[in-house]
Amino acid sequence: MKRALLSVSDKTGLVSFAKGLIDRGFELVSTGGTHRELAAAGIAVTSVEEVTGFPEMLDGRVKTLHPKIHAGILARRDDPDHMEALANHDIQPVDLVCVNLYPFAATIKRPDVTRAEAIEQIDIGGPSALRAAAKNSDSVWAVVDPADYEAVLTGLDQDDAHLRQKLAAKVFAITAAYDAQIVHYLDPEPFPEHFTPTYTKRQDLRYGENSHQQAAFYVEPDPNPTSLAAAKQLHGKELSYNNIKDADAALAMLREFSEPAVVAVKHMNPCGIGLGKTIEGAWDKAYAADPMSIFGGIIALNRPVDLATAEKMHKLFLEIIIAPAFDDDAYAVLAKKKNVRLLTINTADTPAELGTETTAIYGGLLIQTRDNQTETPADMTVVTTVKPTDEQLKALAFAQTVVKHVKSNAIVVAQADQTLGIGAGQMNRIGSVELALTQAQQNDNFAGAVMASDAFFPMDDCVDYAAKHDIKAIIQPGGSIRDKDSIEKANQYGIAMVTTGVRHFRH
């Protein structure tokens, strides 16, 4: 008779799976709560203690860690010496191991969890049995996921060796991810000696950045509730690779603001950001910032979408709209377009994201802390004769907040509640200045605008160009060996200039 070892934390589908195994000639061996669950369902089951002749001990820390279990799993069926050793020690082979792991990740999510409670949820016997079965998958089934039970029963009928190998790989992937979560809990150092990230595939994507590239979307085990990975899609086509990148960029910008805000993004750069007393007012500002570029854009709002705002957005082609919620009548209007993707997520009043970000390079990985630095008027040093007004200080702070989300070289022209022009990704700074001001001067709200730069001005040409296009105040990090030239140029034109000492490159 074949033997199956069952020891699961997640009892989903357990009884029906056990019955399926019995129907296929298996004897069931089980532990603790799993044994009780099966016995209560009237299923014949043998306890591990009866097999090993040794009781569970140390409050359940030692159950299956015994030669009569592990030798039965690991013995190679095609090796006469292995099989003779089993016979000599009266050990029966184990042909299937069904184990899922202690809920460590769920335990450490609890805000009140103690270290002792977390440690007790580190599974030892489960991963050991699973890995043993996976190592010997030429003969032994390793089952770690209740979602696979039906496929396993079918595979047993067909002696599906390919499925056994696939499930073995899944075991090693899951136990590796499980161990990685333990590592991160015990040592939350952002730059550890060994970096072991763990992600689970959410979905295969139609293609990557371009149609000839393949792609998939992976998520963390417990994504932050304000992250795109935690979003709920209510309507529209499946998200694409570019959609996901753009939406993530939009949310990163949106987190900067507590007042009603709307962010419009194209190709991971903002094309319009507006603030208002209402979300409709914020939309009006974001739209007016660049009515051309917003077409086909990704829109993120930090307040529920009402009918008035929805009716305005409905007039445009938009790829994605992300908000905390949609009023029923607003949703009805927006959902008339079958392709627009409507997502809900916790965006209201969320703080700037923390933690680290990674960038893959060929042969390696870069890790850095996120650029969470935000400058306020208190962080600004006036370096010119003319001092900025209070309204200009507000506008400078807003422009400075936006510029760190723009690809370098980055220039933002703005009022206190609206971007007017954005110059992104130019290889020289004056090129970005020209782009931003060309766009900004088309806006009816341009008078009195200010300008932000993500890095210092290497020469005074940027200030000269800004002055000739009626910029009234400038914010920049400073730090160039030619700072004096830019400051003198600002004084010459009567422009207020402040420095922050903080650069915001974005590559």
From Swiss-Prot:
Q: Which molecular-function annotations from GO does this UniProt entry contain? A: IMP cyclohydrolase activity; phosphoribosylaminoimidazolecarboxamide formyltransferase activity
Q: Which keywords accompany this UniProt record? A: Hydrolase, Multifunctional enzyme, Purine biosynthesis, Transferase
Q: What is one term from the GO cellular component aspect held by the record?
A: cytosol
Indicate yes or no for the key word Hydrolase: yes
Q: Which domain of life is it from?
A: Bacteria
Query: Where is each MGS-like domain found?
Result: 1-144
- State the SUPFAM superfamilies in the record: Cytidine deaminase-like (SSF53927), Methylglyoxal synthase-like (SSF52335)
Task: Name a biological process GO annotation.
Answer: 'de novo' IMP biosynthetic process
Pathways per UniProt: Purine metabolism; IMP biosynthesis via de novo pathway; 5-formamido-1-(5-phospho-D-ribosyl)imidazole-4-carboxamide from 5-amino-1-(5-phospho-D-ribosyl)imidazole-4-carboxamide (10-formyl THF route): step 1/1; Purine metabolism; IMP biosynthesis via de novo pathway; IMP from 5-formamido-1-(5-phospho-D-ribosyl)imidazole-4-carboxamide: step 1/1
EC code(s) of this entry: 2.1.2.3, 3.5.4.10
Its recorded reaction(s) are:
(6R)-10-formyltetrahydrofolate + 5-amino-1-(5-phospho-beta-D-ribosyl)imidazole-4-carboxamide = 5-formamido-1-(5-phospho-D-ribosyl)imidazole-4-carboxamide + (6S)-5,6,7,8-tetrahydrofolate; IMP + H2O = 5-formamido-1-(5-phospho-D-ribosyl)imidazole-4-carboxamide
HAMAP family linked to this entry: PurH
* Domain comment (free text): The IMP cyclohydrolase activity resides in the N-terminal region.
Q: Which family does it belong to?
A: Belongs to the PurH family.
Task: Report the protein name in the record.
Answer: Bifunctional purine biosynthesis protein PurH
Organism name:
Lacticaseibacillus casei (strain BL23) (Lactobacillus casei)
Q: Provide the gene name from the record.
A: purH
